[in-house]
């Protein structure tokens, strides 16, 4: 997404523009693309269909902040769960590609999957591997997932205003 662009809007054209890139990634054996900021190409933004969520070694939840990425409801919900249900520190800030190697956990969040674990990021042949691996979520990511899906399924009490009865 570009400054003053439409990356912050959930629009069909935004998804269409990423189709060539994702098809190319799949041909090369990758599941997804990591999009960086267009100005410096040093800051993590999002993938074609999900937002990033990182966890530091001291259990701080970090999400990239940019005016050019989609303000995901799932990401916002996970931030709320992290702070108010799990008592975790949360940082919404610029995340530099150079610091990604230092995170303990990485996931992609969105409506359908809630959170999917990321085990490895490949940057021009350089591999960044996360301790939790690709098959399982890390412990903090798993707690976030279980708490948010528990709220969605009615097993955990929802915050005020999150659920509306439709008759």
What role is predicted for each listed range?
Residues 1-46:
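Short, conserved active-site entrance elements at the starts or edges of catalytic domains
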Residues 36-167:
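Conserved catalytic-core subdomain
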């Amino acid at each position: 997404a570009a400054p003053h662009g439409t990356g912050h809007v959930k629009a069909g054209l935004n998804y269409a523009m990423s189709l060539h890139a994702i098809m190319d990634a799949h041909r090369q054996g990758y599941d997804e693309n990591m999009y960086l900021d267009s100005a410096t190409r040093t800051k993590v933004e999002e993938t074609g269909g999900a937002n990033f969520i990182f966890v530091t070694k001291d259990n701080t939840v970090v999400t990239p902040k940019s005016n050019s990425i989609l303000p995901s409801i799932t990401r916002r919900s996970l931030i709320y769960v992290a702070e108010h249900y799990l008592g975790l520190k949360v940082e919404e800030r610029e995340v530099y590609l150079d610091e990604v190697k230092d995170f303990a956990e990485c996931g992609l969040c969105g409506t359908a999957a809630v959170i999917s674990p990321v085990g490895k990021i490949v940057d021009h042949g350089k591999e960044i591997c996360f301790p939790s691996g690709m098959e399982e979520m890390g412990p903090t990511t798993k707690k976030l997932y279980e708490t948010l899906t528990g709220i969605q399924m009615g097993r955990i009490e929802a915050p005020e205003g999150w659920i509306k009865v439709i008759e």
